[in-house]
């Protein structure tokens, strides 16, 4: 058995800088050798012994030992280098460019992480560009929220650029396009223009004289015109109608949270983005393949100004289900009192995940694994939770927790003091104490009359009556008797000195119950494991007990 465990432990140690995790190794071993699953408790000491020996070795010694077992570590490392950018000549300049309409959510993390990863890999600069040229979609507090979220995620920003600070710059380049005859002011009715565009027919404004366009442009800037746009001259017969003379400036008189009513003409994304990407010196741009058409539109800007285009990498769509990601829906829900805030555990914001106990390293790692492949990807919450578990398991103290509690009175059993480790693998964490004196809380819907149960780490009972208060009789101590009778193992909390706990679940449910008395020692922000329930982060501690946020199993 040790021969099978050793290579798993060595690979795990290489993955985590020379330190293998016994539980992770056991999990891999059991998945590869399912015949041992029923003997997991017997296998664990062997795994711990192998891991202990492996962790004494240096990283080079671990690699050498794995090679002695026939694995080509260098080839594997080369293969796992994985993420590469095309056409890297020197240092790279990249950008993460969210709209400040709210804090970042899990979907934003992919672009943030991958841009950061490549800048760190190749050297260079990462620019945070806040694209706030639509006053209607700007949340003032989001500017700082986004910076805070990136800092927590471990993304290092070298420069912050805010587009609303650059409006005059966009005007300068917009005017140049008009002067070159590549853009024109269009006052056509939008529906009429759409009909002409779909037929591949130019509108009446397209051939207007440059001088007349410049005069109209100035009137736009002075707030004298409404319902007009500046359009870029492209191919009016282009196979994709959306690319035919698309708009690059529009009139918007909604006051901007940062600049007030100073401006009433704003650039559209397919103008401001290429101008900024060029002037800020972008070498590589990561974007979803849903932006392929935008890349084609922006190519006209590069062509007209004679600029070299950066390297565009279009990756597949990341499909994220079972969570709220729409910023407008979240904002509306917060305003209406449906959600407690941007960190409500039902939401998909990084703040909500942080509150639940998801580590930034776990999010960073899963986004690296998803990478820049062109195929669409369905996001796996289970994979994120598995990575997070590897990070938190070793430090998470263990406690019992019962929810929807029912009081159970047990007759015929003597008072007993039970001492259990705070962590099965960390004796230095000390012990916790549970004192049985006849009355306990158990999970409310677990009991049936005339059935045997085993109170975890204690003894066997037979339930006689289930009512508002349940009654049972002591049966025996021997675990073998419980196994023979197929008795369900249940958690229990002594009624005396129990601690009130609420657990906020991601689906909106609130599980109320009790934890054991030593749970009172935990502090806010600790991450612990309620055995057979899951990992939780301590969110609040007061005279009414504790509020915890559920992370995962």
Swiss-Prot record:
A motif ('HIGH' region) lies at residues 98-108. It holds the Pfam family tRNA-synt_1c_C. GO terms for biological process: glutamyl-tRNA aminoacylation. Keywords: Aminoacyl-tRNA synthetase, ATP-binding, Cytoplasm, Ligase, Nucleotide-binding, Protein biosynthesis. It is an enzyme of class 6 (ligase). Its main location: cytoplasm. The keyword Cytoplasm applies. InterPro entries: aa-tRNA-synth_I_CS, Gln/Glu-tRNA_Ligase, Glu-tRNA-synth_arc/euk, Glu/Gln-tRNA-synth, Glu/Gln-tRNA-synth_Ib_cat-dom, Glu/Gln-tRNA-synth_Ib_codon-bd, Rbsml_bL25/Gln-tRNA_synth_N, Ribosomal_bL25/Gln-tRNA_synth. The keyword DNA-binding does not apply. It is found in: Cytoplasm. Signal peptide: none annotated. HAMAP family: Glu_tRNA_synth_type2. Catalyzes the attachment of glutamate to tRNA(Glu) in a two-step reaction: glutamate is first activated by ATP to form Glu-AMP and then transferred to the acceptor end of tRNA(Glu). This is Glutamate--tRNA ligase. It comes from Methanocaldococcus jannaschii (strain ATCC 43067 / DSM 2661 / JAL-1 / JCM 10045 / NBRC 100440) (Methanococcus jannaschii). The lineage of its organism: Archaea, Methanobacteriati, Methanobacteriota, Methanomada group, Methanococci. The gene is gltX.
């Amino acid at each position: 058995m040790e021969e099978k465990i050793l290579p798993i432990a060595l690979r795990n140690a290489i993955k985590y800088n020379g330190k293998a995790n016994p539980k992770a190794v056991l999990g891999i071993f059991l998945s590869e050798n399912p015949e041992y699953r029923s003997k997991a408790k017997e296998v664990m000491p062997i795994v711990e012994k192998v891991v202990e020996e492996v962790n004494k070795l240096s990283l080079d010694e671990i690699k050498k030992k794995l090679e002695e077992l026939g694995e080509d570590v260098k080839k594997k490392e080369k293969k796992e280098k994985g993420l590469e950018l095309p056409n890297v000549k020197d240092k790279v300049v990249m950008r993460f460019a969210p709209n400040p309409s709210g804090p970042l959510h899990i979907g934003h993390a992919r672009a943030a992480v991958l841009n950061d990863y490549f800048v760190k890999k190749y050297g260079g600069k990462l620019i945070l560009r806040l694209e706030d040229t639509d006053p209607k979609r700007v949340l003032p507090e989001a500017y700082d929220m986004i910076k805070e979220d990136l800092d927590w995620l471990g993304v290092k920003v070298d420069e912050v650029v805010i587009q609303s600070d650059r409006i005059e710059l966009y005007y300068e380049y917009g005017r140049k396009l008009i002067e070159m005859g590549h853009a024109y002011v269009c006052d056509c009715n939008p529906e009429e223009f759409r009909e002409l565009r779909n037929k591949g027919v130019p509108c009446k404004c397209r051939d207007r004289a440059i001088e007349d366009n410049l005069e109209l442009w100035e009137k736009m800037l002075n707030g004298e015109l409404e319902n007009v746009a500046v359009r870029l001259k492209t191919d009016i017969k282009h196979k994709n109608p959306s690319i035919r003379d698309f708009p690059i400036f529009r009139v918007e008189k909604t006051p901007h949270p940062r600049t007030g009513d100073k401006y009433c003409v704003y650039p559209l994304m397919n103008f401001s983005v290429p101008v900024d990407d060029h002037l800020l010196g972008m070498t590589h741009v990561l974007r979803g393949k849903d932006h392929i058409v935008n890349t084609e539109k922006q190519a006209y800007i590069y062509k007209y100004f004679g600029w070299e285009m950066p390297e565009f990498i279009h990756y597949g769509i990341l499909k994220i289900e079972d969570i709220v990601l729409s910023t407008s829906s979240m904002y509306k829900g917060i305003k209406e009192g449906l959600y407690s805030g941007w960190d409500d555990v039902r939401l998909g914001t990084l703040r909500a995940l942080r509150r639940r106990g998801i580590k930034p390293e776990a999010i960073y790692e899963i986004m690296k694994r998803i990478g820049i492949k062109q195929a669409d990807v369905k996001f796996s919450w289970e994979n994120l939770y598995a990575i997070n578990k590897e990070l938190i398991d070793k430090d998470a103290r263990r406690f019992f927790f019962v929810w929807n509690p029912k009081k159970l009175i047990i007759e015929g059993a003597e008072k007993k003091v039970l001492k259990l480790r705070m962590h099965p693998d960390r004796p230095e964490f000390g012990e916790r104490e549970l004192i049985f004196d006849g009355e306990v809380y158990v999970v409310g819907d677990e009991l049936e009359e005339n059935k045997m149960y085993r109170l975890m780490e204690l003894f066997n009972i037979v339930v006689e009556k289930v009512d508002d208060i349940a009654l049972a009789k002591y049966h025996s101590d021997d675990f073998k008797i419980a196994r023979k009778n197929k008795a369900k193992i249940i958690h229990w909390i002594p009624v005396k000195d129990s601690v009130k706990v609420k657990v906020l679940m991601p689906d909106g449910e609130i599980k109320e119950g009790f934890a054991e008395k030593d749970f009172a020692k935990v502090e806010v922000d600790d991450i612990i494991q309620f055995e057979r329930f899951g990992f939780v982060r301590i969110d609040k501690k007061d005279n009414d007990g504790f509020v915890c946020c559920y992370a995962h199993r």
